[in-house]
Amino acid sequence: MTILYAVIACGLLSVLYAIWATRSVLASDQGNARMQEISAAIREGAQAYLARQYTTIALVGVVVLLLAWWLLSITAAIGFLIGAVLSGAAGFIGMHVSVRANVRTAQAASNSLAAGLDIAFKSGAITGMLVAGLALLGVSIYYLILTGPMGLQPNDRIVIDSLVALGFGASLISIFARLGGGIFTKGADVGGDLVGKVEAGIPEDDPRNPATIADNVGDNVGDCAGMAADLFETYAVTVVATMVLGAIFFGGTAVLGAAMLYPLAICGACILTSIVGTFFVKLGANGSIMGALYKGLIVTGLLSIVGLAVATSVCFGWGEIGTVAGMVITGKNLFICGLIGLAVTGLIVVITEYYTGTNKRPVNSIAQASVTGHGTNVIQGLAVSLESTALPAIVIVGGIISTYQLAGLYGTAIAVTTMLGLAGMIVALDAFGPVTDNAGGIAEMAGLPKEVRHSTDALDAVGNTTKAVTKGYAIGSAGLGALVLFAAYSNDLKFFAANGDKYPYFQGMGEISFDLSNPYVVAGLIFGGLIPYLFGGIAMTAVGRAAGAIVEEVRKQFREDPGIMAGTSKPNYARAVDLLTKAAIREMIIPSLLPVLAPLVVYFGVLLISGSKASAFAALGASLLGVIVNGLFVAISMTSGGGAWDNAKKSFEDGFTDKDGVKHLKGSEAHKASVTGDTVGDPYKDTAGPAVNPAIKITNIVALLLLAVLAHG
C-alpha cells in the first residue's frame, strides 16, 4: 500500500504543478484592448463549442452508464463515470487556460521571443500535467478503494471489470472530442483558406475573413482539448490493460500485488521527471525554439531512466519474479523493457520530425513539386504520406519483438506504459501548438508590429512541428497500447474458457485458435481492417461538408457587405462559429459509434451465422488485429503526410528556392499549389488521422467489456 500512496502523491503533485502554472500564466500582461477583444471572441467560441459537445456526450454517457450498471455492476458504472469525467475535465481545464494564454503569449512575444516561448510552453504544460496526473489519480485511487475499503483481491473480476470500464469512459470522451474537434477546426481552416487566401487573396488570420475567429477556436478544441482526451485515454487504458495482464499472469503468486502496482509506479515516477523537465525549457544562446523544447524532453527521458530503476527496485528487485508461459521473468528484464519503451518514443519523435520538419527532404520534395503545379504537389504529398509509415512500423516491430523476448507480453505492456509515462511532457509540446497559432492570429488581427509577428511566426512554425511529432507519438503508443489490450482480450478469453464451471456461458467451448486456416479468422481480419478506412472516409467527408458550409457563409458575408473587404465594417464572426459548432456536433455522432458497435456486430453476426461461440470469439479477436494493423498505417500516413503538406506551404511564406535557384515567394503560382496541398493535408492530419487513434483502442476496450458482460450474465 505504501507504493500506492506514493503513486497517488505523484498524481497530486502533478495537479498542484498545473495550479501553480495556471496562476503564473494568468498573472501575465494581456496586451491592449484590441488584443483582449479578439482573445475574448476566441474564448467565447471555444467554450460555447465545448459546452455543446460535452452536453451531447453526456446524453450518450448516461445511457452507457445505466447499461454498465445493469449488465455488469455498480462498481463498473462508477469506473466508467470516473474515466469519462476526468478525461473531460483534463481537456476542458487545459483549454480554459490555452484560450487565455494566447493573448498573453502575443503580448510577451512583443517583449522577447524567450518570454513568448515561456508563456506558451507553460500553458501547454498545464494540459500535459493534468492529463497525466488526473489519469493516474483516477486509476490508482479507484484501485485503492476497490482493494482497500471494499476488501477485494487485486485479481478479482470486479476489480478488473471496474478498471476496464474506467478505460471505456475515457475512450468514449476521446473519440467524440477527437472527431468533433477535428471536424470543427478543419472545417474552419479549409473553408476560410479557400475563400480568404485563394479567392479573395487575403492573408491567413486577416480580420476581414469571417472564418478567422472560428479557425482560432478550432485550434483549441482540436489540438488542445482533442489531443488531451486522446492521450488521457491511451494513458488510462494502457495502464489498466497492463494491470489486467499482471492479474492474469501473476494471479495466485506472491508478486500479484507488485505486478499490478508496477505500471502505476512507473507512471508516478515519470510524472516527477516530467515536472523537472519543464524547468529546462529555456531559450538558449542560439535562439533555437525546437532546441529549447527538446532540452526539456531529453532531460525528462534521461531522468525517467532513474525513475524506472527506482520503480523496478521498489516493486520487484532485480532478480527472478516468476515464470509466465514457460518464460522466466526478472526485474532486470522488465527494466530493460522500460528502456526499450523510452527508446521507441525517442525514435518515433525523431522520425516524425524528419518527415514533417521544414528544410528536411520530404517537406522540400513537396515544395519542389509545387513549382510544377497543383497536381504534382498532391502526388508528392501522397507519396510522402505513404513512405512515412515504413520507419515507425519497423521501430514498433522491433519494440514488440525485443520486449516479448525479454519478458513476454507483460514486458511489451511495460514498454508501452513507460512510453506513456512521458505523456505529461509530450502533451505539453502539443498544447504549445494551438497557443502559438492563436498568438500569431491575434498579433495579425490586432495589427501589432512586424517584429512581433516575426516572433509569433517562429513560435507557430515550431508549434506545427511539435503538433506533428506528438501525433506520431500518440499513434505509436495507441497502436502498441491496443496490442496490449488485444493481449488482455486473448488471455481473458483463455481464462474464461478454462473456468467454464464458474462462467457458464464459456462452458465446453474448448481452446480458441486464431489460426489463419479458419475462415472466420480471415473474415474477422478483413472486417477489422476496413474499419479505419471507413472511419477515415466518413471523417474526411464530414470536414468537406463543414468546409463547404463555411465557404458559402464567407462568400455570403462578402457579398452582402462590401464594407468587410474595404475594412470599413466588421464581419459576423459568431455566425461562422455557430454554424461550425452545429455541423461538428451533427457530423461526429455516427462515425463515433462505428468503432463502438463494430465488435458487437462481428461477434453476434458470426455467432448467428456459424452457431459457434468459439468461431465468433476467434473472428472478434482477428477483427481487433485488423483494426490495429490497418489503423496504425492509416493514422501514421495521414498525420505525417498532412504535416509535411502544411510545412511545405510554410516554406513559401519565407521564400522557397527551387533546384534551379529560382526563389518562389508568397502569392506565387508555386505557393498557390502548396495551399491546395495543405487544404488536402489539413483534414488528413487534424481530423481523420488523429481520430483513428481512439477508434483503434475503443474497439479493443469494447471487446474486453463484451467478455465481462457475457461472463457476468
Swiss-Prot record:
Q: Does the keyword ATP-binding apply?
A: no
Please list the reactions this protein catalyses: diphosphate + H2O + H(+)(in) = 2 phosphate + 2 H(+)(out)
Annotated residues for binding of Mg(2+) 1: 189, 193
How this chain sits in the membrane, per its record, is: Multi-pass membrane protein
Might you give the EC number(s) for this enzyme? Answer: 7.1.3.1
Query: Per its UniProt entry, which superkingdom is the organism in?
Result: Bacteria
Cite the binding residues for Ca(2+).
646, 678, 682
One cellular component term (GO) for this entry is:
plasma membrane
What family is this protein classified in?
A: Belongs to the H(+)-translocating pyrophosphatase (TC 3.A.10) family. K(+)-insensitive subfamily.
Tell me what this protein is called.
Answer: K(+)-insensitive pyrophosphate-energized proton pump
Q: Which organism is it from?
A: Mesorhizobium japonicum (strain LMG 29417 / CECT 9101 / MAFF 303099)
Its organism's taxonomic lineage begins at: Bacteria, Pseudomonadati, Pseudomonadota, Alphaproteobacteria, Hyphomicrobiales
